[in-house]
Every structure is written in structure tokens, then in C-alpha cells.
């Protein structure tokens, strides 16, 4: 079977949560894998006893300590990579069938470059909740949110083509990298199975509850950089609820034709026209 490299990334939320053992993240139904646990020195040392124990028991598991002046992306590209490269946040773990399901999909669709899968959340007591059944590839939705999530798999060649300029994935939750993937290829697919489970605490309502302000700022910068690269005239902002949104700037006022298909219902037509005239602030429209 094809060799697959899993990059387990130590993030801030992994530090303050309770990552399960490295063993629980490795799907046992697919044999040909290697796991690199990647993180900045101080983060990695918080999990040192866990990583070393499994590294001594299985040589396929290796820690990759990153210096403060080194980017994770540079270290990953310098390392030995399998035919497929997978990124997994260490507050998540894989379903037992995850790797075999992904490789099977790549074999069924050999033109695909990148795959993502459905996911859910798991509480400290082992309760699974909030499954996220994702749509097929949607570049527009990706601009609104990182719906691809915290587990994905790509061909090594795609990662090499993108290069190292995709930021610190430990901060922005892989968003920068996925946005770069979307600019490099449209051969992107979904595995319609829940293949990863992300830990949340009993106090958290969702996986984003533990995000720091720095994480959100990094995501906003990743999105703004992507819009700039694509030549979009837009600004990334936060709304009153703290959610990230994109405001596209309108440089001209093209004519908008409003079609109302109820000409024989004067009562409805009058109300509709009145609402358009009283509410809209856009100057260039016709009814």
C-alpha cells in the first residue's frame, strides 16, 4: 500500500487540553504510515513523556522540534515524506478506518490531489456529538469558514508545488494551507464518513471555544492574504458576535434587475415594490 506520512501538529489548544495517547490517533487498519509530531520546543516538551514512550516502542513515531526562528512548513518539507501527507491537529484523533478509507478513495479517484472528511466532537466522558457532514468541494464556502476542518490528506507533490510559504499551521488551524491548496488545484474531494473526532471540554460548546485571540487574528490574516493574492477587493472583518466575515468593496454600481413574478396579485406586488423602494440604499436598480 502507498506510504503515508501523518503530521500531528501541537497547537495551543492541545497544550491546555488532554491529548489522548499517540496510539489512539493511529488507525490500525492501515499499516504503511509514519507519524511526525511537530511543534515548537516549549509546546512539544509539554508532551515529551508521551511522545518519547511511543517513539521508543514504534520507530515510525518521531517528534520534530521546531526552533523559534524556524517555520513548521520549512521543517516538514525538509523531512522524508510519504506519497501522501496528512495533517492532524493533536486535539483530534482518527477513527480506526480513517487511513484505509482515504487511501481507498484516492485509488478510486486517481486524479484527486486533496481529500477531507466529515468529523464530530467528543467530550471528556467519551460522548460523541455534533457531527459535521460537510458538502462536496465548495471554494466559496471555504472563504466563509475553514469547513475542511482539522484532518486532511494530500498528495506529496501538491505540498511540494505549494512550497513552504503557508505560515504557522499551529496558529491558524491549517486555514492558510488549505487556502493555498484551493489556489493550486481544484481536484479536491470529500470522504463522506466521520473519520476524525475533536476533543472539547465539558465547559465548551464547540471546537472553536478554545481559540485564542492570536488564533483568530492568524486566521483573519490568512484569509486576507488569500483575497489579496486572488486580486479580490475585499476586507476581512469581525462582526458584533466576533465571527469572521468578508466585506467585498463595490467599485461601481452595475444595474440590478429585480423580477417580481406576481403581477396578477396587486396586494402582494404593492407590498413588494414598497419594501424595495423604502429599504434599499442601492441606487442602480430596475423593477
How would you name each of these model-derived features?
Residues 22-23, 82, 95-108, 159, ...:
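Short alpha-helix within the catalytic core of nucleotide-sugar-dependent glycosyltransferases
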Residues 93, 97-129, 201:
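Conserved donor NDP-sugar-binding/catalytic core segment of glycosyltransferases
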Residues 80-93:
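Short beta-strand-to-loop acidic/aromatic patch adjacent to the donor-nucleotide binding site
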Residues 139-224:
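Conserved nucleotide-sugar donor-binding catalytic segment
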Residues 1-24, 224-278:
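N-proximal low-complexity "stem/linker" segments adjacent to membrane-targeting elements
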Residues 66-80:
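Glycine-rich, basic loop-to-helix element that forms the pyrophosphate-binding segment
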Residues 23-32, 108, 274-284:
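Short, acidic, metal-binding catalytic loop of nucleotide-sugar glycosyltransferases
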Amino acid at each position: 500500500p502507498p506510504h503515508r506520512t501523518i503530521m500531528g501538529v501541537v497547537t495551543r489548544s492541545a497544550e491546555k487540553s488532554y491529548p489522548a495517547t499517540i496510539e489512539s490517533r493511529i488507525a490500525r487498519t492501515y499499516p504503511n504510515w509514519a507519524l511526525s509530531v511537530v511543534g515548537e520546543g516549549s509546546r512539544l516538551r509539554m508532551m515529551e513523556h508521551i511522545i518519547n514512550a511511543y517513539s521508543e516502542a514504534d520507530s515510525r513515531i518521531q517528534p520534530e522540534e521546531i526552533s523559534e526562528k524556524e517555520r513548521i512548513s520549512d521543517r516538514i518539507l525538509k523531512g522524508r515524506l510519504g506519497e501522501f501527507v496528512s495533517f492532524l491537529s493533536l486535539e483530534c484523533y482518527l477513527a480506526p478506518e480513517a487511513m484505509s478509507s482515504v487511501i481507498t478513495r484516492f485509488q478510486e479517484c486517481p486524479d484527486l490531489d486533496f481529500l477531507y472528511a466529515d468529523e464530530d466532537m467528543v467530550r471528556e466522558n467519551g460522548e460523541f456529538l455534533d457531527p459535521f457532514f460537510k458538502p462536496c468541494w465548495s471554494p466559496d464556502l471555504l472563504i466563509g469558514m475553514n469547513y475542511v476542518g482539522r484532518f486532511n490528506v494530500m498528495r506529496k507533490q501538491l505540498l511540494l508545488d505549494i512550497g513552504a510559504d503557508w505560515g504557522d499551521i499551529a496558529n491558524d488551524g491549517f486555514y492558510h494551507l488549505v487556502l493555498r491548496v484551493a489556489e493550486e488545484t481544484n481536484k479536491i474531494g470529500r470522504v463522506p464518513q466521520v473519520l476524525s473526532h475533536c476533543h472539547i471540554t465539558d465547559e465548551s460548546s464547540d471546537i472553536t471555544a478554545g481559540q485564542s485571540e492570536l488564533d483568530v487574528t492568524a486566521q483573519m490574516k490568512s484569509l486576507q492574504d488569500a483575497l489579496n493574492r486572488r486580486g479580490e477587493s475585499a476586507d476581512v472583518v469581525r462582526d458584533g458576535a466576533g465571527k469572521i466575515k468578508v466585506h467585498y468593496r463595490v467599485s461601481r454600481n452595475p444595474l440590478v434587475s429585480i423580477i417580481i413574478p406576481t403581477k396578477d396579485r396587486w396586494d402582494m406586488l404593492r407590498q413588494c415594490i414598497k419594501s424595495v423602494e423604502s429599504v434599499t440604499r442601492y441606487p442602480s436598480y430596475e423593477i
